[in-house]
Curated annotation (Swiss-Prot):
Intracellular or extracellular location(s): Cytoplasm
EC number: 6.3.2.9
Alphabetical UniProt keywords: ATP-binding, Cell cycle, Cell division, Cell shape, Cell wall biogenesis/degradation, Cytoplasm, Ligase, Nucleotide-binding, Peptidoglycan synthesis
Molecular function terms from GO: ATP binding; UDP-N-acetylmuramoylalanine-D-glutamate ligase activity
Family (UniProt): Belongs to the MurCDEF family.
Catalytic activity as recorded in UniProt: UDP-N-acetyl-alpha-D-muramoyl-L-alanine + D-glutamate + ATP = UDP-N-acetyl-alpha-D-muramoyl-L-alanyl-D-glutamate + ADP + phosphate + H(+)
Known function: Cell wall formation. Catalyzes the addition of glutamate to the nucleotide precursor UDP-N-acetylmuramoyl-L-alanine (UMA).
Name of the protein described by the UniProt record: UDP-N-acetylmuramoylalanine--D-glutamate ligase
HAMAP family cross-referenced by the UniProt entry: MurD
């Protein structure tokens, strides 16, 4: 019986373990943690014949010390660094090593896939695509970074029409044969440099997904894409919220002509009106860009405009992405916890009604904060800083001459203080848009957003 070792006991790792066990592999799982939740999962999987080793820092020697067979295959969960020296060693010894998404692809590649990547916008675009496909009567669940883990779909074994996958750079680099029918690139700006090292490396990892996609769709409004990639794929579809042409920003080259664009209040495909932009409930120009990309996917998948219009008009938005929580004393409280980098936070702040009270901070990331700081100066009546980045953010604000900030440290204090300040500042919005990861105070950005939502709902009751 061939042996496989899975690194990581999260949702994707659990599904991968069960899938491989069903396929006849001798499966072991390792995780460096040892929480109560992991112990409970360890017991559950043990009852299924899948041994789990906690407090295990992966290496081939560590597996040998546990008397585990040398694995024929290693499957890596998305959060595990692909360049981990122990993984490099395994690959050098000829052990097949890849990610959970690659495993799912190998099990589900008989179906057409939509693969959606990008620094920002990929989750919302994925959710709109899923809604459109559902309105068209297609069995096309979203997976990857949204909805199911990809291996959960494979494990379920249900017949599908399409697989719609939100794909991160972490998943792309560990999925060497993933080849979607339709590949989408929403935006590009520096992110995850602590893992990928350079902007160029990050860009090339993202580009791999489109290189291997049969049909390609890119956002022509995004400067990171239009400046760096206009002619890499001559057959690509481009979108534009500015009509049937792109700004002359293609590094001296002639810009590609958009196939899907907004004109006279309509999303048009090759000039044909498909859906009115005003039927979409979500805020912001960036969500118009997401809509365009989703309509482009639907068009290439052969979905009619009636299903598109129905899905768009009823789509409620996505949790933690400019999610309207409540209106309290005339002030809108908005959850944008998914804004984990400067570009996303700048976009969120620009989209809400001003003057706004901004709640920002968390675990800081490397990136260019200039546009974000400029938008704060223009839109924010007050900035309330939380988390480990609060001190550094206060220094950045002070350096640009912006003094309307307070360090409040925690979300509880931030929401309470925002409610106190809103009347005197005549604020129209209180926005959580952190520009940071969440891991200093929360397990993930969803937990952070859930906490903010609960505090706002308590306030309004």
């Amino acid at each position: 019986m061939p042996a496989v070792h899975i690194i990581g006991l999260g949702r994707s790792g659990i599904a991968a373990a069960r899938l491989l066990r069903r396929e006849g592999w001798q499966v072991s799982v390792g995780d460096a943690g040892h929480s109560e939740g992991l112990v409970a999962t360890q017991k559950t999987l043990a009852a299924e014949g899948i041994p789990v080793h906690l407090n295990l820092k992966f290496s081939l020697s560590a597996l040998a010390e546990l008397s585990l067979d040398r694995p024929d295959r290693i499957v890596v969960s998305p959060g595990v660094p692909w360049q981990l020296p122990a993984l490099e060693e395994a690959r050098s010894q000829g052990i097949e090593t890849f990610g959970e998404l690659e495993l799912a692809w190998r099990s589900l590649k008989q179906y057409p896939w939509v693969g959606i990547t990008g620094t920002n916008g990929k989750t919302t675009t994925t959710a709109i695509v899923e809604a459109i496909f559902k309105a068209a009567g297609l069995r096309a669940p979203a997976c990857g970074n949204i909805g199911y883990s990809a291996c959960e779909l494979a494990l379920a074994g249900d017949p599908l029409d399409w697989v719609i996958a939100e794909v991160s750079s972490y998943q792309i680099e560990s999925s060497p044969t993933l080849a979607p029918t339709i590949g989408v690139w929403t935006t590009f700006s520096p992110d995850h440099l602590e893992r990928h090292g350079t902007v160029e490396c990050y860009r090339e990892i993202k580009a791999l997904l489109l290189n291997q996609s049969k049909q390609k769709i890119l956002n022509g409004d995004d400067q990171g894409l239009i400046k760096g990639l206009p002619w890499r794929w001559a057959d690509a579809y481009w979108t534009s919220s500015h009509g049937p042409s792109l700004p002359d920003a293609c590094n001296g080259q002639r810009c590609p002509v958009p196939n899907i664009f907004i004109e006279e209040g309509w999303v048009k495909v090759e000039g044909e009106p498909i859906v009115q932009v005003s039927s979409m409930r979500m805020l912001g120009v960036h969500n118009q860009q997401n809509l365009l990309l989703a309509v482009a996917v639907a068009h290439l998948a052969g979905i009619g405009k009636d299903a598109i219009a129905t899905a768009v008009s009823t789509f409620p938005g996505v949790a933690h992405r400019l999610e309207h929580i409540c209106t309290w004393q005339g002030v809108d409280f908005i959850n944008d916890s998914k804004a984990t980098n400067y570009e996303a936070a700048q976009t969120g702040l620009a989209a809400v009604n001003s003057p706004a009270i901004l709640i920002a901070g968390g675990e800081a990331k490397v990136g260019d904060d200039q546009a974000w700081l400029q938008t704060i100066q223009a839109q924010a009546a007050k900035v309330l800083l939380i988390g480990s980045a609060a001190g550094a953010f206060s220094q950045r604000l002070k350096a640009i001459g912006y003094d309307d900030y307070e360090i409040v440290d925690t979300m509880n204090k931030a929401v309470t203080r925002a409610a106190e300040l809103a009347p005197s500042l005549q604020a129209k919005s209180v926005l959580l848009s952190p520009a940071c990861a969440s891991f200093d105070q929360y397990q993930n950005f969803e937990r952070r957003g859930d906490h903010f939502r609960q505090l706002c709902q308590d306030l309004s009751q």
